[in-house]
Amino acid sequence: MDQLYLEIEISTQKETTIYTGVSSFLALFTYKFLKDPKNVRVNFVSTKIEGGKIALRSSQLKKELTDRHITCRDAASLPAIQDLKLPIYEKDGNTFIAGTCAVCRELIARQPNEELKKLLGFKGSCLLAPSEASIWTKFCEVDLVAVVSKLHSGQVLEFVPQEVVRFEQHMNEPVRMHNIYKQAREQANQTENGGKVKRRERVQIKCTTPKEELLIEHRFAEGISFTIADIILYPLLRIVFQHCGQMLPHFPLTSTWFSEIDSFGDKCARVLRDLYVPQAIKTPPGELGIPDCEATSLYKADPKRYKPRNRIYTSQLELEAALSKLSSLQLQFNSDSEHTYGQQLIDWEQIEPTHAKSSALPKERLERKRQQLENLANAVVSLAQPGDRIVDFCSGTGHLAILLALKLPNCTIIVMENKAFSLLQAQKRSNELGLTNCVFYQCNIDYFVGGFKIGASLHACGTATDIVLQQCRRAKAHFVCCPCCYGSLQPMPHISYPLSKAFQKVLDTKDYLYIAHSADQAHEMGTTNCKPETTLQGLHCMSVVDTDRLLQAEEAGYQVILTRLKPEQCTPKNHLLVGRFVKQN
């Protein structure tokens, strides 16, 4: 049986009020929407909830709220409960999923009823992309959740939250869906009683017709079909509007959306009524202000979300000016090192005798991939001790993690990846090899809060490498990282550039991004369109960025080696950072 872990906090005063976090509330809401599926057992994890707390109607939870189903997080025997942010979905005994949308999707996907699986949208892709990669998933899983959390922390609104305005604008956008022209033709050729018009009288709609001119409007959050996005957004927006006084009439499309869901079936409203205890609301007199909000799409693929005027275009003069500022640091920017990790070759035929035949990679590319893996595996082995927990961040289909599991049978290897399909492939290969020391976490890096001894990542894209290094510093864990996509570095709420105190003294963020941009000009010598002088400049910029990473780690108490993979031709992005935590600053 699958397990669903939700966080609760029981008040100490007479223990009558039961609270949960916003994300766990959404998972419980989905579970109740599915009518308490019999193949999933709910487990409540007693913890101190951070952020806003939602009071639950405990009368609806009598069946689940027994001592047998309540675990204390600090004393949990299951490591995943301490490793991941709640809610967590467990399946197959060694796979754990964190993240609101991913957990709610899995609740639906694991149901035998095929009709329910239609809630996952076309090809099961609704909210499939992780929040790091999808603005739409981030809106549902992060942005609106943060709004509700603040409201339940006592925030009094002066303005309608910007997220409400963004959703109203989203509902005014043209519908994006598969076969939209087919749907438009069917809609245009239906009679009032639902029948079809005669063939010669049919309205013709060409595929060259702009989508804005098609008479298809949003009924639901993702178009004309009720999906998991509606299940997640409905309780969030209902709660927000409870704190907005009489502001709903100012948002007619959102109001119509509420009505559509309520008329589609009262299940959402009923589940919300059964679970949610409204809090006492303090609203200022009069109407709330409505913030101005630029009309940008909530879909990543929509060209309206790209703002070319805001992008950084690096000129040679700006790059040279940024690099010249570093001269005062009197540092050597290079990756030359006496330490290398490519000498110990691995007998791949012994480890995975059939993988070369089944791999989709061409022979030469497979060889280069294996050389990359050898370097990282050897570096991790040089740091590992029996019993260590080792995390392969951004694991993809698990090539590095599986190699580590084979070479270090006395260590636990955590395979962490936010894409469900990739993690499924990793699990399949692990099962084929009979590995018993792998645990699989489907989640964003930020949802991992557990302890570990070594963190590794091979070509984690852009800022993801710096999030991995941040996780290692948090856990005081050794690290082995081969960075990638330097040009994709972007500041985030918890990551700012430059990283090290030394670089911060001489560079601002814009200077730093000029250098990072140029680091992506490093191509393999002799390849098409490769200018030697540009490639050498790109290699120098790679060394600058990775020296900044090295200095930041040294400031946190690490001994760090910056070297290159061997042979160096195995990848253009061949830098390797190996850090050993030695002291607490």
Curated annotation (Swiss-Prot):
GO terms for cellular component: cytoplasm. Transmembrane segments: none annotated. InterPro entries: Glutathione-S-Trfase_C_sf (IPR036282), Methyltranfer_dom (IPR025714), SAM-dependent_MTases_sf (IPR029063). SUPFAM superfamilies: GST C-terminal domain-like, S-adenosyl-L-methionine-dependent methyltransferases. It holds the Pfam family Methyltransf_32. Residues 120-275 form the GST C-terminal domain. PANTHER family: GLUTATHIONE S-TRANSFERASE C-TERMINAL DOMAIN-CONTAINING PROTEIN, PTHR13369. Belongs to the GSTCD family. This is Glutathione S-transferase C-terminal domain-containing protein homolog. It comes from Drosophila melanogaster.
